[in-house]
């Protein structure tokens, strides 16, 4: 079991680095899928088969595939993106170092007064499945954080739609109210065109 743990952990670290360092976005998504698969392997080692299945079905089957479709459909200029990244490389490195230092300080301060013990055991009932145990905890003790997380995701979805929704003036569209208000008097126009000159000064709506 420790061999598989270190194997999955090493593969997760390597694939995560490949996600960040890959120049091609399609390769980054493929490495991300590989990361999720190894993460599900860790869940199986911990005995959480339901979480492993959710990680495969939701993250790999929905989110990662959605990323892949979006990247394949978008016409991304990778050379231009790399040029912009090089222009802001110093700022990116500075922000990364600050976040890394913050993470290290947080880990050191949070684990300073922890007493480690290897004689820790958890009572697991044989008549309760993995899914039922997660549901009992999720909808009782963590009901409020679960609802708040759903609300945050809903707000993020609405924000993405608002930011990407643009009004296009060049596209022709129908005005149902104006179409229903038309009648014979404002639709039919009787004219007397001059011979060989055609009809002029007619406004179409």
Swiss-Prot record:
Catalytic activity: a quinone + NADH + 5 H(+)(in) = a quinol + NAD(+) + 4 H(+)(out)
Keyword tags: Cell membrane, Membrane, NAD, Quinone, Translocase, Transmembrane, Transmembrane helix
GO molecular function: NADH dehydrogenase (ubiquinone) activity; quinone binding
Keyword hit for Ribonucleoprotein: no
Matching InterPro entries: NADH_UbQ/plastoQ_OxRdtase_su6 (IPR001457), Nuo/plastoQ_OxRdtase_6_NuoJ (IPR042106)
TM helices/strands, residue ranges: 1-21, 26-46, 54-74, 89-109, 142-162
GO cellular component, one term: plasma membrane
EC number: 7.1.1.-
Pfam families xrefs: Oxidored_q3 (PF00499)
Taxonomy, superkingdom: Bacteria
Membrane topology value: Multi-pass membrane protein
Compartment(s) where it occurs, according to its Swiss-Prot or TrEMBL record: Cell membrane
Function: NDH-1 shuttles electrons from NADH, via FMN and iron-sulfur (Fe-S) centers, to quinones in the respiratory chain. Couples the redox reaction to proton translocation (for every two electrons transferred, four hydrogen ions are translocated across the cytoplasmic membrane), and thus conserves the redox energy in a proton gradient.
Protein family per UniProt: Belongs to the complex I subunit 6 family.
NCBIfam families xref list: PRK06638.1-4
PANTHER family hit by this protein: NADH-UBIQUINONE OXIDOREDUCTASE CHAIN 6
Protein's UniProt name: NADH-quinone oxidoreductase subunit J
């Amino acid at each position: 079991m420790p061999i598989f743990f270190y194997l999955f952990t090493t593969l997760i670290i390597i694939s995560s680095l490949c996600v960040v360092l890959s120049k091609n976005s399609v390769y980054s998504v493929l490495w991300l899928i590989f990361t999720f698969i190894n993460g599900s392997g860790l869940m199986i080692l911990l005995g959480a088969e339901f979480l492993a299945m959710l990680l495969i079905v939701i993250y790999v089957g929905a989110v990662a595939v959605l990323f892949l479709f979006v990247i394949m459909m978008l016409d991304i200029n990778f050379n231009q993106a790399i040029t912009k990244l090089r222009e802001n490389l110093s700022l990116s490195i500075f922000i990364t170092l600050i976040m890394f230092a913050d993470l290290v300080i947080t880990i050191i301060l949070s684990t300073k007064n922890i007493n480690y013990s290897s004689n820790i055991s958890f009572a697991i009932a044989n008549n309760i499945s993995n899914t039922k145990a997660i549901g009992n905890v999720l909808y009782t003790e963590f009901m409020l954080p679960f609802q708040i997380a759903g609300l945050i995701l809903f707000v993020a979805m609405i924000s993405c739609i608002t930011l990407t929704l643009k009004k296009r003036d060049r596209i022709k569209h129908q005005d149902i109210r104006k179409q229903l208000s038309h009648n014979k008097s404002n639709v039919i126009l009787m004219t007397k065109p001059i011979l060989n000159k055609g009809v002029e000064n007619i406004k179409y709506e």
